[in-house]
Swiss-Prot record:
UniProt GO BP: mRNA pseudouridine synthesis; tRNA pseudouridine synthesis
Name this polypeptide is given: tRNA pseudouridine synthase B
EC number(s) reported in the record: 5.4.99.25
Stated family: Belongs to the pseudouridine synthase TruB family. Type 1 subfamily.
Presence of the UniProt keyword NAD in the record: no
Keywords for the protein's UniProt record, in alphabetical order: Isomerase, tRNA processing
Length: 327
């Protein structure tokens, strides 16, 4: 006969009718309280993808840890780190959906950036040591607009030394904090849209809306802009307003993963899943395409390409597929 636990018994010397509100014979909270805490307040597996709004003065990692703790989330990850200076949208996934983040992080990102001219920063933003420029050149609106047009054509960018870019296995900022000179390689970027929102000629600052590709550093754009104008500049404030086509309207909503991918969807049945798990190709009559989202009901189970009406997998989430097949 199997052992059973009777929460209504007096095995722990408890008195009172409620299994969670009783006290011991000496008036201390009953052990039953701890069973209540364990069953109702332990961290739960809540699978979701959502957008959160990160405030200023906190790192993305710390913000996510606090959110996970508050919502009793066991495992969570985010895509597209925001510096502590910045606020705005952060793409977050939990449990198995964290595996999708590297694929979701390909979207363009839109920012509102406030830039101060006539000064420069060791980190290119307000978090570093800020120094004034001797005999600064006054920026005019015409000169600013011309420089923005030139900057929007940039296809390469050197990341800031105070960044998480890896150098010999360590983040660049690790060397920068020690005063060591390092050289970072330029990365490919694309500036899709540039709009000058506001320019204050008296205070020598401006607000710019930039839509950029993944990996683009807005503080590097601010520094480059200052140099183009034959002065210096730093990023004094930053807000991420959109990720792809998703803005603040989508905050705190649990979203279907397939709705976040800008890819053609290939819908599969159970038989297809079993064949793919065995490493077999399956016929799928559609136009040739290099990357597609593989869907079973509401689950993203992998990615694949279609060549000559044959589906060839690029990435399969095997454990997820096995779980589907076995249920």
């Amino acid at each position: 006969m199997a052992d059973t636990l009777d929460l209504g018994s007096s095995a722990f010397g408890c008195k009172g009718s409620s299994p969670f509100l009783r006290t011991t014979m000496i008036g201390q909270p009953c052990v039953d309280f701890f069973f209540f805490f364990f069953f109702f307040f332990k961290k739960k597996k809540k699978k979701m993808i959502t957008f959160l709004y990160k405030p200023k003065k906190i790192s993305s990692a710390k913000f996510l840890r606090q959110w996970s703790k508050t919502n009793l989330i066991k495992k969570a990850g985010h895509a597209g780190t925001l510096d502590p200076l910045a606020s705005g949208l952060l793409l977050v996934a939990t449990e198995d959906d964290t595996k999708l983040l590297q694929y979701l992080d390909q979207k363009t990102k839109t920012y509102l950036a406030k830039i101060q001219f006539g000064f420069w920063s060791t980190t290119y933003d307000a978090e570093g040591q800020i120094y004034g420029v001797e005999q600064p050149i006054k920026v005019t609106k015409d000169n600013l607009e011309q420089a923005l047009n030139r900057l929007s054509e940039s296809q390469k960018q050197v990341p800031p030394v105070f960044s998480s870019k890896k150098v010999s296995g360590k983040s660049a900022y690790h060397y920068a904090r020690q005063g060591k000179q390092i050289e970072l390689k330029p990365i490919s970027i694309k500036i899709s849209k540039t709009i000058l929102i506001n320019f204050d000629e008296k205070l020598q600052n401006c607000v710019i809306m930039w839509q950029v590709s993944r990996g683009c550093y807005i503080r590097s754009l601010a520094d480059d802009l200052g140099k183009m104008l034959k002065t210096r500049a730093y990023l004094s404030d930053l807000e991420r307003t959109k990720i792809g086509n998703f803005d603040k309207k989508f905050l705190n909503q649990s979203l279907k993963p397939q709705d976040l991918f800008d890819l053609q969807q290939v819908k599969l049945d159970l038989e297809n899943l079993e064949l793919l798990l065995q490493g077999k190709k399956i016929n799928y009559f559609a136009k040739n395409s290099e990357l597609n989202t593989l869907i079973f009901k509401d689950e993203v189970v992998g990615f694949g390409k279609i060549i000559n009406n044959v589906l060839i997998t690029k990435k399969l989430f095997g454990n997820r597929i096995k779980k589907i097949i076995n249920t």
